[in-house]
Structures are given as structure tokens and as C-alpha cells.
UniProtKB/Swiss-Prot annotation:
Belongs to the ribonuclease III family. This is Ribonuclease 3. Its EC number is 3.1.26.3. GO terms for cellular component: cytoplasm. Keywords: Cytoplasm, Endonuclease, Hydrolase, Magnesium, Metal-binding, mRNA processing, Nuclease, RNA-binding, rRNA processing, rRNA-binding, tRNA processing. Residues 6-128 form the RNase III domain. The keyword Oxidoreductase does not apply. Its main location: cytoplasm. It catalyses: Endonucleolytic cleavage to 5'-phosphomonoester. One of its GO terms (molecular function) is ribonuclease III activity. SUPFAM superfamilies: dsRNA-binding domain-like, RNase III domain-like. Homodimer. It comes from Buchnera aphidicola subsp. Baizongia pistaciae (strain Bp). PROSITE patterns: DS_RBD, RNASE_3_1, RNASE_3_2.
């Protein structure tokens, strides 16, 4: 990745890295290099959850724990992170292996969402908690303003199930197509099958739950609900 490309992405993110190798690693998928972004993703996931929880606690002093948990889940879920990635054009900067490139990995929601988390982890390591907190709140400014405690925050599987029930259609089936990697570092590929949709929708994630949620989200998109 050349200097011009790095500069362009840093401008989009609103942060200039001291250690450019952390930025490169955050953008590197496991299919491209053994020095990939999954550990950074793990770190970024925890930091994001803390920052959003802290913001909700102070922005909504009269909202109960259950509603705040649902609000946080909506703000940190893969679909929201993928939207942020699209806003940043992150797909243009991903380092992917040939297989992922050919299968359209640069557009895959799970890969994009994981990369946002990895970037959060890398910026934290390159700076400090205060810096990454300020940056996350900047990225989430409009979303934090728009989220409403009175809205029922439901995950994609729940929304899909309720939609199908409202149409008196059979509930979806989630089928494990592939499990890749060691027991402590697995990647799940899951298909969601729904009566009335000819094509299965796919979800890929670091856990079965995450993969099922992505498959359900893609089904909602295919049905034209979202």
C-alpha cells in the first residue's frame, strides 16, 4: 500500500498513524497474510462496546439497563459497523487473498465490520483510550443522536422471524455449510433458507451466532425489508 493511499484513508478516518504497520495489519484479512487483523478485531470489539456503553450511560440518564443494552447492541452490531465501513469506502483498502477477492470479500458485511473493529484496536494501540474514544464518538455522532430508547432494538434474526410470522410464512432454517480453522479461532459459514426465496442467503462470522445474524440480515435485504 503506497503512501498516497495511506494518506487518503487516514484523512477519511480522521487519524494519522505513528506506526503505519498497525494500519496495514488492521486492513489485512486472514486470507491474505499470517499477520492478519483478528487480534486487533478482538481488542477493538471490546473498546467499541465500552465507549458506546459509556456514551449511552451519560446521554440517557433515565433509561434502564435493558433498554441501554438493546441500544448498544444495535449500535455495535455488524450491520451498523458495515455501514460505517461503506461510508469510509473501506472495501477499497482491504488486503484480501485471491479467493476472497474473487468471491467479493471486499463487499462482504462481516469482513467490513470486522475491519472497523480492527481499526479501532489499531488506533488504540497507536495512541491511547482518550484518542480512540473521541474518534469513535465522532464516527457515531449522528447515530447516537438518532437512536431512540423507546424503539425496540431487535437483532436481524428476531426481525426476520417476526416478519415471516406476520406473513404466515414458515420460519427460516440456518444450516452450517462450513467451519474453518482451529477450535479457538474458527470461521463459520452459514446459509439461511426461507420458503419463498429461491436463493439462500449466506452469513460468515467468527461464531455461529454472528454468522446466523449476518445471514438473517442478508435475508432481510433480499426481501426488501431493509
Amino acid at each position: 500500500m503506497n503512501h498516497t493511499v495511506i494518506q487518503k484513508l487516514q484523512k477519511i478516518l480522521g487519524y494519522t498513524f505513528i506506526k503505519k504497520d498497525l494500519l496495514i495489519q488492521a486492513l489485512t484479512h486472514r486470507s491474505a497474510n499470517s499477520k492478519h487483523n483478528e487480534r486487533l478485531e478482538f481488542l477493538g470489539d471490546s473498546i467499541l462496546s465500552f465507549v458506546i456503553a459509556n456514551a449511552l450511560y451519560h446521554c440517557f440518564p433515565h433509561v434502564n439497563e435493558g433498554d441501554m443494552s438493546r441500544m448498544r447492541a444495535t449500535l455495535v452490531r455488524g450491520h451498523t459497523l458495515a455501514k460505517i465501513a461503506y461510508e469510509f469506502d473501506l472495501g477499497d483498502y482491504l488486503q484480501l487473498g485471491q479467493g476472497e477477492l474473487k468471491s467479493g470479500g471486499f463487499r462482504r458485511e462481516s469482513i467490513l465490520a470486522n475491519t472497523v473493529e480492527a481499526l479501532i484496536g489499531s488506533i488504540f494501540l497507536d495512541s491511547n483510550l482518550k484518542t480512540i474514544e473521541k474518534l469513535i464518538l465522532k464516527w457515531y455522532k449522528n447515530r447516537l443522536k438518532a437512536i431512540n430508547p423507546s424503539d425496540t432494538q431487535k437483532d436481524p434474526k428476531t426481525r426476520l422471524q417476526e416478519y415471516l410470522q406476520s406473513k404466515h410464512l414458515p420460519l427460516p432454517s440456518y444450516l452450517v455449510e462450513q467451519v474453518y480453522g482451529e477450535a479457538h479461532n474458527q470461521l463459520f459459514t452459514i446459509y439461511c433458507e426461507i420458503s419463498g426465496i429461491n436463493e439462500k442467503t449466506i452469513g460468515i462470522g467468527s461464531s455461529r451466532r454472528k454468522a446466523e445474524q449476518e445471514a438473517a440480515q442478508n435475508a432481510l435485504i433480499k426481501l426488501g425489508i431493509e
